[in-house]
Every structure is written in structure tokens, then in C-alpha cells.
């Protein structure tokens, strides 16, 4: 029992405080950029829906690139251009895991922040945990280690791309 309790507490504590920990401890890492994305996404889910569609049809590819790697906080004033592709990218990641559509803003912000934060710190927690669950469920108990080997390969090889592709491919 004494072994079980700390691990459980640690698990739930991590889940509960993932976003705050990220911002406090890792503010200086690239994650700092993501807050720009997350903010605009929160606004998008909150009701900016009409604005991004207006001028962004043609530009959608380039802003998506700059948005992910570059100057989000400065750009967020320009939301008509970079929001649409960015949000599209995030929706693909976030939607499979969001049961309550009613939450709106909270959904976009907390969910995407949690998944980014978690996988930044410990690949096993975000999609990693889920993917290995699925895989080990199929293969049985022996497959659990296999699944993790595969996962680390995926994370090393494709990083962001393979991860955003896999949940969609699976569903």
C-alpha cells in the first residue's frame, strides 16, 4: 500500500499541475512560444470563429509554418492570418481527446496546453501513455515494453509530425 499511494499521488499531482508547472519551470524553453498559440486558440474556441476565415484562405500554408516555429506572441495581433491553420493543426490534435464540446474556451486552452506540456517533459504521459495502452492491450502484457520501444522510436524519428498523424490515423 505504501508503494502504491505515493505513485498515485504523484500521478494525479502531475496531471493536475502540468500546465502550471510548465509555465513556472519551463517558461524559458520553447514552450514559452506556445502560449501565443494557446491564447489565440482559446480565443478562437471562445467565439472568434468568423474572423480567421476571412482573409486566410490563400495564406493558410505559410502562416502555419511561421506560427509553429516562430514569433507567435508578436503575431497574435494578426490573427486573421495565422490563426486558421494553427487552429486547424491544433484541432486535429485536440479534438480526439475532448469529450465536452460545451466548454469552449477552456477546452482549447487547457487541453492543448496539457498535451504539449506533458509530452515536452515526459513523452510517456501525453499521447505516449495512450498509445502504449492501446498497443499493449492488443499484444497482451508482454507487449508493454515493445510498445514503449516503438514509442520512443516514434518520438525520436518523427517528433511532432508522426505524433499529430497517429491519433488521426488511428481513428
UniProtKB/Swiss-Prot annotation:
Pfam families: Myelin_MBP. The modification Phosphotyrosine is found at residues 14, 69. PROSITE patterns: MYELIN_MBP (PS00569). It is found in: Myelin membrane. Residues 44-115 are annotated as: Disordered. It comes from the Eukaryota. PANTHER family: MYELIN BASIC PROTEIN. Homodimer. Belongs to the myelin basic protein family. This is Myelin basic protein. The gene is MBP.
